[in-house]
Amino acid sequence: KNFSKEACREVVRLLGNAGYVSVADDVNMENYEEVETFYQAYVKAHDAEVTIFQVHSDGLLGVLTFIHREGSLQTYYVGVDWKEGGMPYIKNTLVSDIAKITYTPKGYLIYTYKEDIVHSDANQYLRVKPQSDACRELTRKYVSGIRFADYDAFVTSWDSSTVEDILEPCLFEDLYRIHTGESIRTESGWIPAEEYERIMMLYLPVTKEQIRRKCGYDAQRGSYPYEMIFAEPYAPFGEVVDFTENADGTITLTVDGVCIDKEMDCAFTNELVVQPFADGTFRYLSNQSNFFTSNRSFKI
């Protein structure tokens, strides 16, 4: 209970200082070189193993060991929970055979189990190589709240002169979450025009007239229909890998699209320009997408 992000980072750091490989979501892996050493041994068909401590946001600890022996690759997982008073106990264990494992140029360890695990994606992954604090923070602020499937805005090129082309009703759901920090709730299935247009015009260089043309405005109701996003499985996600602070106060973000399902740590690259405002909000001004694969099946 009350396990903060700061506490999570501190546990990862303490485990790292003690010599263990440790990681958490949005936290760089400590002693990541041991994972690279393991993979190099695996590629050379040498026996090897490495243990990784995964600190979860709820305070649980996952201990994941990769073992390569005589051509066979397995993981042995131990889940550790806590009793009252802080006493640890083993909550569950699991041994799984791995069908294949890949280490990408940017440092993603991607692996696939021979048998499907319930509530698990087809491919699993760990971010091994560290990211800079600046790029990680820019990812959190400008990229983590958007999608690279389900709508076209961040998998196509546009600017202020063509922004109307990317307007879709389902865009509002993510922009609302970015703005409020909460998921949208509507009992009637309609969103008041004032709120809808205010948020859309804040985060995109669009006019009220453009929004009304493209997003289903109902003049009689003075509202827009709520269009729920049904998330695409195995969708790519973005990470900022470089950035430029421009003289006009805007920031140009270089955003790589990571597609774990296709074992690609850079399926496409975006040059995304954002304009930060003094109150902490911002606006997406333009996007330039460059794809490095002809297979864009993750794009609706």
Regions found by a protein language model. Give the residues of each.
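Mature, Sec-exported extracytoplasmic domains of Gram-positive
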Residues: 1-300
